[in-house]
UniProtKB/Swiss-Prot annotation:
Keyword set includes Transport: no
Name recorded for this polypeptide: Pentatricopeptide repeat-containing protein At4g19220, mitochondrial
Region of interest called Type E motif, as start-end residue ranges on this chain: 870-945
Positions annotated as PPR repeat: 121-151, 152-186, 187-221, 222-252, 253-287, 288-322, 325-355, 356-386, 392-426, 428-458, 459-489, 496-530, 531-561, 563-597, 599-629, 634-668, 669-695, 697-731, 732-762, 763-793, 799-829, 835-865
Amino acid sequence: MLLVMVRSSTISPKSLRLYCSGHIIDSLRHSISRWNSPSGYCSNYYFSKRKHKRHFTSSVLSPVTPIVHNLFDELPERENRTMESSFMFLRDVLRSFMMRTETETPRSVHCFALKCGLLQDLATSSKLLTFYGRTGELVSSSCLFDELKEKDVIVWNSMITALNQNGRYIAAVGLFIEMIHKGNEFDSTTLLLAASALSSLHLSRKCSMLHCLAIETGLVGDSSLCNALMNLYAKGENLSSAECVFTHMEHRDIVSWNTIMTKCLANGHPRKSLQYFKSMTGSGQEADTVTFSCVISACSSIEELTLGESLHGLVIKSGYSPEAHVSVGNSIISMYSKCGDTEAAETVFEELVCRDVISSNAILNGFAANGMFEEAFGILNQMQSVDKIQPDIATVVSITSICGDLSFSREGRAVHGYTVRMEMQSRALEVINSVIDMYGKCGLTTQAELLFKTTTHRDLVSWNSMISAFSQNGFTHKAKNLFKEVVSEYSCSKFSLSTVLAILTSCDSSDSLIFGKSVHCWLQKLGFGDNMLSANSVINMYIGCRDLTSAFLRLETMSETRDLTSWNSVISGCASSGHHLESLRAFQAMSREGKIRHDLITLLGTISASGNLGLVLQGRCFHGLAIKSLRELDTQLQNTLITMYGRCKDIESAVKVFGLISDPNLCSWNCVISALSQNKAGREVFQLFRNLKLEPNEITFVGLLSASTQLGSTSYGMQAHCHLIRRGFQANPFVSAALVDMYSSCGMLETGMKVFRNSGVNSISAWNSVISAHGFHGMGEKAMELFKELSSNSEMEPNKSSFISLLSACSHSGFIDEGLSYYKQMEEKFGVKPVTEHRVWIVDMLGRAGKLREAYEFITGIGEPQKAGVWGALLSACNYHGDTKLGKEVAEVLFEMEPDNASYYISLANTYVGLGGWEEAVRLRKMVEDNALKKLPGYSVIDVRCLDTVS
C-alpha cells in the first residue's frame, strides 16, 4: 500500500530517498533561509531567548501580586501538603486557567510548580508551555522548554503550537527541523503543526516533503493530517496532488470531503466540486453546513439556476433550512443573485431569522450586479435602521463600487466620510483602493490623487486604481508617469495583469502608439500575451491609437482562439473611435467566418456605426436582425436605435422606437430629445419634455437649450436656465457650453459671457462656443484674445473644434493673415492635424477677400483630393465675386462629386445671372428641374411671442 501511494502521488521515489538520507531537512532549511540570518534557522527565536534569559529568572520567580496568590488559597492544609496533592492540584489549576490570558497567571503556576519540583513531569510542563503560548509569553515558554532535560513528542508539539499561535511561523518550522535533526520521535500532530506553519509562510511547494515523512513513518492514515496536506497542496495551486491524497485516504470524514470540495472551488474548478459532492452523497456521508455552502457557491460560479434550486430543496430536506442556518442562507442568496433571480434571493433574505452583515452584503451585491441600484441602497439603509447591523469593510467596498459605477459623487463622498469616522481606512487598504477607484469613475481625479498620495502603505491595487483614474479622465500623461513609477517600485515578477491593462486604456491617440507598443511588449514579457483579456485590450489600444493595421493583425493571429469578445473589441472599438466603416467591415468578416454568433454588444457597435455614417438602410437591417435574433430588445439597444435614426434624419422612426419602449429610462428620453433637436424639431422637443415624469439631468437640459437655440427663443432658453440653476446643474461644463451657444445665437452675447465666466469649471466645448460666438458677431479680435487665454491654460489644450471656431472668427472679421498664421500653427505648435472643416474656413476666408486664385491654389496644393465642402466654399466665393470662369471649373468638379446636390447648380446659375449670362443660367435651372433636384430654402427664426412655458 505504501509503494502504491508513492507511485501514484506526485511524490517521486527520489524525494523519498532524499528523506531517507536526511537531505529533506536541509531542503526545508533552505526554504526558510531567506527569512533568517546565517547564524541559525530559528535565529529570531533563539535571539529572544538569549536576550531575556536573565529577565526570565527574575520575572517568573519574583513575588507576584496578592490577587494572583489567591489562586493557591484553596489548597487544603497548605502547611502539610504532599507531593501528590500538590501535583493533582497543579493539574487542576492548569485545566481551569488554560483559557486565561493574564500574563501573571502562568508565571504564578510556574513558580508553584518550580517550588514543588513538579516541572520534570512532562504532562505538567507541556500544559504549562501551552498556557504560556496562549498568553503570548514566548520568552518564558522558550526558557521553560530549554530547562527540560527530557522532552517527549507532546512537549515538542506544545512548543511548536505556542509559536504558531503567536505568529512565529519561521521559528515553528525551525523548531520542527531541530526536532527531526536530533532524532526525536514525532507524530501526526507534529506534521500537522508543521503543515500549518508552512501554509502561513506560503511555502506550499514544500508540502511534498511533509507528505514523504508521513508516508515513511506510516502516519499518512491520519485523517486530520491528510486534510492538512490537501489544504497545503491546494493552497499552492497543486490540486492534482491534493486529489491524490484524497483518493488514497482510507477513512474520510466530513472535513476531508469539505476540504477537497472547497479547494476545487477555490482553484477555479466548480464542476469538480459538484462531482465530489455527488460522490460524497453516494458514499453515504451526510452533508453539513460547510458542504452545502460550498456546493451552492459552485452553482453560483457556473450560474446553474436549475441545479441551484435543486440544492436549495435538498438543503431544506436535510434539515439545514436557510432560515435557521445563516451561512447556508447567505450562499443561497448569492447563488440566486448571480443567476439573475433577484426575487428568489430577496425572498430567502427576508425569511432569514438571524441576519448578519454577510447576509446583507450578499443581497446588496446581488442587487448591484443585476443593476438594481436603488434596491441596493435600500438594503444599506435597512441594515442600519431596521436590522441594527453595522456595515463592515465588505459593505463599504460594495457601496463605493456602486457609487463609482453610477457616478454618484455626492453619495461616494458620504461613504468616504463614513470610512474616516469609523477608522476603516487605517485598518483595511482595500477601503482606500475602492475610494480611489470611485473618485476616478466620478471624474474627481484631484480627490483620488490626494487620497493616493496621503496613503503611506500602498499595494499594487492602489497604483492600478490611480492609473485607471488618470486614464479614464483623460490625464494620459499623468497615467504614464505613474506607470513608470510602478515599474521602478515593483519588480516585473510582481506585476499583475490589471496594472498593464490599466495603462493600456490611456493609449487613446496616435501620439501614444509607441508607448502602447512598449506596453504590448511588457504583456508578452510578463507572460500575459496569450491571455484573452489582454489580447482584446491590446486590440482596443491599437484602435484607439488609430493603428488599425496592427489591431486587425492582432485579431488575425488569434484565428484559433479569438472569441466573441475579440470581435466585439474590434467592432465596438472602431465604432467608438470614429472608424465606422471598418466597424461594419469587421462585422461582415465575422459573419462570413460563421463560427461565432453576434450578441447585443455586437449590434450596439454596428448600429452606432450605421448612424454615424448616415446609412439608414443599413441601420434598419441591423434593427431587423436585432428583432430576429434577440428575445427582447434591451432598453440600451432601443436607445441606440433612437440615436441612429436621429443621426440619419429619420425622426419618425426615432419617435416610433421610443414609443415602443415599455419603461423608458432617462437615457431614452435624452436620446429622443437629442434626435429631435438635431433635426430642427425644437417645438416637438418642448412638447415631449412636458410629458417627462423623471427627474431631468444635465444631458436633458443640453437638449432643451439646443432646441431653444434653433427656435431663437430666449424665453424657452431662460426658463430652462432657471430650472437647471434650481437643480444645481449650472456648473456642468457641457451645460455651460450650451448656455453660451444659446445666448449668443439669440443675440445676447454679454449674457453668454457672464454665464461662461461665472460657471467656475469650463470644458473645452465651452471655450469653443464662446470663441465661435464672438466670431459670429464679428468680434474677431475678442475671439483671438479668448483663444490666447485658452492656449495659455495649463489644464486643457485647444482641439480640432477650437481651431474651427477660431478660423471661423478670422473669416467673418477679415483677419486673413492671422487666420493663415493660426492654420500653420495648428500642427506645428499644437499638434492638431487639419481636417476638411479647417480648410473650408481657409477657402472661405480667402474667398471673402477676393483672393480666389490663392484659394484655388490652396486646395490643389494640399496634395490629396478634397471633399465637396471645400470646393463648395470656393464656388460660393466665385458666385459672390462674379468669377464665372473659375466658378465653372469648380462647379464641374462638384458635379462629379455630388451630382444630386441642387445648391451647386443654383450657385453657378446665380453667378451667370449676375454677369448677364441668362442662357447658361436657364440651362442650369432646367437641369435641376429635369433631375427633380431640390434646394432646401434658407430661413430665419425670431421670437415674437411665446405663451408656452417649460414645466
